[in-house]
Design a protein with these regions (language model features):
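Mid-to-C-terminal secondary-structure elements
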Residues: 117-129, 143-283, 481-538
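Alpha-helical transmembrane segments of integral membrane proteins
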Residues: 1-20, 274-277, 307-344, 356-476
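N-terminal membrane-entry
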Residues: 276-295, 377-378, 382
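Hydrophobic alpha-helical membrane-associated segments
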Residues: 28-35, 292-298, 345-353, 389-394, ...
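Bacterial inner-membrane juxtamembrane interface segments
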Residues: 17-38, 53-68, 82, 86, ...
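Membrane-proximal extracellular/periplasmic loop immediately following the first transmembrane helix
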Residues: 37-99, 209-221, 234-236, 257-268, ...
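Generic structural signal for small/hydrophobic residues in well-ordered secondary structure
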Residues: 12, 22, 43, 59, ...
């Protein structure tokens, strides 16, 4: 093998122009493929680190007419836990309002915080640095923090049992410290406080009664027992809403079903329209994977065409090798060695291109990759597979063609390419131009669509409009006073409040025309609450 590589190196060095063109083409193809491999591997790895990942499901509220929600009525999870033996664990989660900020050295700091039931860490697997996952959320005013939060407020000291003050007067006992939440998790938080804290803050008010069927503001995850037949369970729980609260829902012209969404589907295949965590689309994964395949094919076809175009230059070499006793298999191995060596050299050049391209790629894909990301075992393994595939695709056909020359034909100068070979090369060239044209056309189409969206009338004047998130205003603050204070500024012409951004729904619901209660008259609606100045302000 070493001898093959030495001869391959000499041949590549001898034909420098050919080598540089192929090297650059393969390097560009491999760099694109490695970047997309990094992206696809990362996308498909989300939520895979949980020990019980295959048994974790998220509850969905299914609207038969569309607009499924990942938030549920409060009693649903309790009923599932108590009445369905297939369900091993149930957990409630809910976003903590921004007003519940950390008070530290006279300043307020807002963090991404959630309420969670005491079984949260029995369902999800997060690495504990301090504390016991089984009891960390079992009492009111317990809080679990990430390593970054601990370092920010306490440095390197042990913090288990220490007090963290929120909203000026609420004292929380630190019951656990966990590693920072991995990027490969759809659940992202910095602090997690017990759900019993929420019950204390609402004076022990229970939403598990009749009123809870109208409160769709809690997210639930369930852990199923091993061996559970999920389709059968879904069929059993589908009608839970209508069975338990049908009268009320019919009166409100609503119809909901209970659905289950596997943890593995939440990020890429979610059926929810109001997701709170990072979400993407499996279609984007397929799209970029297709681009990687096409770019690699272009590089390989370019290599094949250039190599076979030089067949006349290598024919004498092949003839002489056969005269001195080399077999066709040996000659094929020599040409495959050249393809392998060129691919490996292209990989090193491609690695430089990848390093230089990472900032742009991160900006384009909304990621935060660095060189260390390329050292993941899956990326290394995938890259080795890519090298093998490129070597086979680009080297095998030229090796077969070139090793097929007969010494007698070479000595006589009869080195004619068969009609089949000519047809194949022409087909490869046509395919190469077709793929290139398709990618260019797709690029211009996307640019055209983006320009079209940017130029469309939004229905309001977005210039000189500033949006402030006033959910951070303490609960006892006067919004009227705040509005008046802003209005007094000389640079402010008009002020308005709403519960959502322009163009985004604040709420979703179903409405019916008066005196026509019934599903056939229901209208799915997205709506928002605004004040009397809203239209004039926009």
């Amino acid at each position: 093998i070493l001898n093959y590589l030495k001869i391959a190196y000499r041949n590549l060095k001898r034909f420098k122009g050919y080598t540089y063109i192929n090297l650059l083409g393969l390097a560009l193809g491999l760099s694109v493929a490695v970047l997309i491999l990094l992206f696809v591997t990362d996308e498909l790895a989300l939520d895979k680190f949980h020990k019980n990942k295959d048994r974790i499901y998220r509850l969905l509220t299914i609207n038969p007419t569309g607009g499924n929600m990942e938030t549920n009525a409060w009693p649903v999870a309790t009923i599932l836990k108590n009445e369905y033996p297939e369900v091993e664990q149930v957990v409630y989660t809910r976003k903590v309002p921004p007003s519940l900020m950390v008070c530290y050295e006279g300043k307020d700091y807002e963090h991404n915080t959630y309420y969670a039931g005491e079984d949260f860490f029995q369902i999800f697997t997060f690495n504990f640095l301090e504390g016991n996952p089984e009891t960390a959320l079992s009492k009111p005013y317990q809080i679990v923090i990430t390593r970054d939060i601990k370092d920010k407020y306490f440095g390197s000291e042990v913090v288990l049992g220490k007090i963290l003050t929120l909203r000026d007067t609420l004292e929380f006992e630190i019951s656990g410290v966990i590693d920072n939440i991995p990027d490969r998790s759809h659940i992202q938080f910095e602090m997690l406080t017990s759900f019993k804290t929420y019950e204390q803050l609402t004076d022990g008010f229970s939403y598990n009664g009749e009123v809870g069927w109208g409160m769709f503001n809690v997210r639930n995850y369930i852990l199923l027992n091993e061996g559970t037949n999920v389709p059968q369970l879904e069929a059993k729980i589908k009608g839970l809403y209508m069975d338990r609260a049908g009268d009320w829902l019919n009166e409100m012209c609503m119809e909901f079903h209970v659905g289950l969404e596997p943890l593995s589907d939440i990020y890429l295949r979610s059926k929810s329209s109001n997701g709170f965590g990072p979400q993407a689309s499996i279609s984007r994964v397929y799209l970029v994977s297709g681009i990687a395949i096409f770019v690699l094919l272009l590089a390989c076809i370019n290599f094949i065409n250039l190599t076979t175009a030089r067949s006349a230059y290598r024919a004498k070499e092949v003839g002489l090798r056969k005269i001195v006793g080399s077999s066709r298999r040996t000659i094929m191995a020599q040409f495959m060695s050249e393809a392998l060596l060129l691919t490996i050299l292209a990989l090193f050049l491609g690695a430089i291109i990848v390093d230089l391209s990472l900032p742009f790629f991160n900006s384009l894909m909304g990621k935060n990759y660095d060189v260390g990301s390329l050292l993941d075992i899956k990326i290394i393994g995938g890259t080795i597979v890519l090298v093998a595939i490129v070597t086979l695709l680009s080297g095998y056909y030229p090796a077969v063609v070139l090793s097929g020359y007969q010494p007698v034909d070479v000595l006589k100068g009869n080195m004619h390419t068969s009609a089949k070979g000519v047809t194949l090369r022409r087909a490869l060239v046509v395919f190469q131009f077709f793929i290139s044209g398709t990618l260019v056309l797709a690029t211009f189409t996307v640019i055209s669509q983006l320009n079209f969206m940017r130029s469309q009338n939004l229905g309001f004047d977005k210039d000189q409009v500033l949006i402030l998130d006033v959910t951070r205003v303490p609960n006892n603050a006067s919004y009227d006073a705040f509005q008046n204070a802003i209005s007094q500024l000389s640079t402010v012409e008009s002020v308005s409040f709403s519960n959502a951004l322009p163009g985004r729904p604040g709420w979703q619901g179903q409405w019916a025309y008066p005196d026509t209660i019934g599903a056939e008259f229901q209208v799915d609606t997205e709506y928002m609450a605004v004040d009397e100045h809203y239209i004039a302000t926009l």
